[in-house]
């Protein structure tokens, strides 16, 4: 299994744990996944691709009346994952 396979697996687990309850613990796990991705040098585009794949899997099993809630939760989770990328970019730009 590759690093990206591990990342995809961990992302899927955390995302699917976040969807039903939107718990702070699952959201925190999303942040940690983003942090690990930055440390491991995963590109933001690769992370977006993983998010997209996992979201599409979830949407296939989502009843029509819940699509808006799932899309909203997915956005919240993805923003938390991307928070570390934002901090790293700001740190880089501030260091110029």
Language model features with spans:
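Non-catalytic regulatory/interaction regions at protein termini and inter-domain linkers
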Residues: 1-95
């Amino acid at each position: 299994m590759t690093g990206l396979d591990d990342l995809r697996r961990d992302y899927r687990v955390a995302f699917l744990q976040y969807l039903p309850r939107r718990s702070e613990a699952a959201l925190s796990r999303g942040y940690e996944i983003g942090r690990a991705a930055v440390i491991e040098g995963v590109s933001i585009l690769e992370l977006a691709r993983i998010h997209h794949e996992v979201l599409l899997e979830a949407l296939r099993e989502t009843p029509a009346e819940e699509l808006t809630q799932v899309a909203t939760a997915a956005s919240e989770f993805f923003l938390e994952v991307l928070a570390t990328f934002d901090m790293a970019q700001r740190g880089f730009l501030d260091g110029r």
